[in-house]
């Protein structure tokens, strides 16, 4: 998966031509500031791969009918919400018959309740709740995001998935992020692997496999490495990085039948 946000469209297109065909493209940011967007869309339209546009409902703009039915729009909504602007955004997408999904960025229980009111009032069908860590809402995360033993044990998992989690990070593996200056990150929370102006995609992949911290980040650190549920839990996410804690759960590793609530 490639998430793109870069100023030089021609350089980006040249770079993308060196990549495999069967990948997902995600364009993230303010579409009004993307130069030669039509040219980029024309290039992406040559491929049958999945394509997404990720943007905020405030700075949302459908660049042209050239995008119609090509992209899945993932529209982020943060609080407080400008209802008038939200209606304009969703109506614009509906008018062009574009597929879209609303993502509510939730930082508190109050945000969650307000989001539900909007979903029910405006009969929104496709939506997600995206917990946002602010640095000040750890209690909200402990109550609503951290896993309990029952959460871990109730998750279905194949033998294949069990072993995959011991080798790679399911959240990050295979993803790169191309920034406006051309820097390439496997995860934007870690230093850049290189730049599209100076490194080939193959060099960047090799560097991530050999030296990177993202694709192969698994639960092999304390306290997870001493927990009997080590490989049953989801792969580490960005939340662990932002919060500065390797385990986002209530499991007591010294007594798995008890929980740290």
PLM features per residue range, with description:
Residues 193-261:
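Flexible mid-to-C-terminal extensions adjoining Fe-S/redox cofactors in radical SAM and related proteins
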Residues 56-68, 132-149, 189-198, 208-212, ...:
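Generic structural signal for short, solvent-exposed loop/turn connectors between secondary structure elements
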Residues 89, 112, 136-143, 211-216, ...:
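Low-complexity, flexible helical/coil segments
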Residues 7-9, 84, 145-150:
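General structural signal for secondary-structure boundaries
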Residues 115-190, 232:
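A C-terminal junction/extension of Radical SAM enzymes
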Residues 11-131:
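Radical SAM/AdoMet-radical enzyme domain recognition
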Residues 2-6:
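Short, small-residue-biased leader/transition segments that mark boundaries at the very start
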